A protein has these predicted regions:
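Short beta-strand to alpha-helix junction loop
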Residues: 56-65, 90-99, 138-157, 167, ...
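Glycine-rich FAD pyrophosphate-binding loop
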Residues: 21-43
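Active-site substrate-recognition segment that forms the wall
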Residues: 18-19, 69, 78-83, 199-280
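N-terminal Rossmann-like FAD-binding beta1-loop-alpha1 element of flavoenzymes
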Residues: 2-29
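Dinucleotide-binding Rossmann-like beta1-alpha1 core, especially the glycine-rich loop
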Residues: 46-126, 251-252
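Helical element adjacent to the flavin cofactor pocket in flavoenzyme catalytic cores
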Residues: 138-196
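Short hydrophobic core segments
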Residues: 5-7, 192-204
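Conserved Rossmann-like nucleotide-cofactor binding loop
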Residues: 12, 35, 204
């Protein structure tokens, strides 16, 4: 029997395993794909978000603020490509100017330091390729960029060096209460037992919760498409550039990547399953 079984070997699951293996615990990582970082952890913007956006008082706000320095620390320890380049949220007109003020106030409530509100002229001094139509910007100096799949792979390797076991092609189909813990069954008939379970299943976390008899939320999956430009364009901007956020998310961003490319996107199209990775 393992002390802890972690379902999902994405960036959250592998970093959780890495942290738990600092202690005298037996840890098992269960992944339904044939390797780590095969879900959202290999297909995202690679942004270390500054923490100004979450609703103050929520768990997300608390963990974002605490998580930023921890993520930079993990990147240094694991030698993962990462840069504290800062971010800017741009406003175009009076209505969006007011949103910038709201985001700044929200960031202050969340305990985020190193923020500043810039005029359009001040923003263009930092980023010469910004549009003349930019009227105001929120500068967030603690934000950054990281290679998410490199982080996931490195965290998994470190956890395994510390004694964690990784079991791939392990699609969880049943979770049964057992004596002193849980029995976790896979589609191909394998089983493990663990005293505690941690659900890190990403886009499938609601399905795992339902299997465990703890259905209290639903994930509505969205797929995003990006344009990845050549490294010759990587210095077009130095900060991660956001629009003001909407109800659907942070919108289209423009950012250098940790590997020196320029990334544009993502879109946010609703799909019927997190496994739908078709492009249009």
């Amino acid at each position: 029997m393992f002390d802890v079984a972690i379902i999902g070997a994405g960036v959250v699951g592998t970093l959780t395993a890495r942290e738990l293996t600092r202690y005298k615990l037996s840890v098992c990582l269960l992944e339904k794909e044939n390797d780590v970082a095969c879900g959202a952890s290999k297909a995202n913007s690679g942004i270390i978000h500054g923490g100004f956006d979450p609703e103050p008082g929520t768990l997300k706000a608390k963990l974002n603020a605490k998580g930023v320095p921890l993520l930079y620390k993990a990147a240094r320890e694991l030698n993962v490509p990462c840069k504290n380049n800062g971010s800017m949220v741009l406003a175009f007109g009076k209505e969006e100017d007011a949103v910038i003020d709201e985001l700044y106030a929200r960031g202050i409530k969340n305990g985020i330091k190193g923020m500043d509100i810039l005029s359009g002229t001040e923003a263009r001094r930092l980023e010469s390729n910004l549009s003349d139509k930019v009227t105001k910007a929120l500068l967030v100096t603690n934000a950054g960029i990281i290679c998410p799949y490199a982080l996931t792979i490195a965290a998994a390797g470190n956890a395994m060096d510390n004694g964690a076991e990784l079991r791939t092609n392990y699609e969880v189909t049943a979770i049964v209460r057992a004596e002193d813990g849980f029995r976790v069954c896979s589609a191909d008939g394998r089983q493990i037992t663990a005293r505690y379970l941690v659900n890190c299943a990403g886009g499938f976390a609601d399905k795992i919760a339902e299997i465990a008899g703890d259905k209290f939320f639903e994930i509505i999956p969205r797929a995003g498409e990006y344009m990845l430009l050549d490294k010759s364009e990587g210095e077009t901007v130095s900060h991660t550039i956001f629009q003001v956020p909407t109800a659907h998310g942070k919108g289209i961003l423009v950012t250098p990547t940790a590997d020196g490319n320029l990334l544009l996107g993502p879109t946010a199209e609703r799909v019927n399953t997190p496994e739908n990775t078709e492009t249009t």
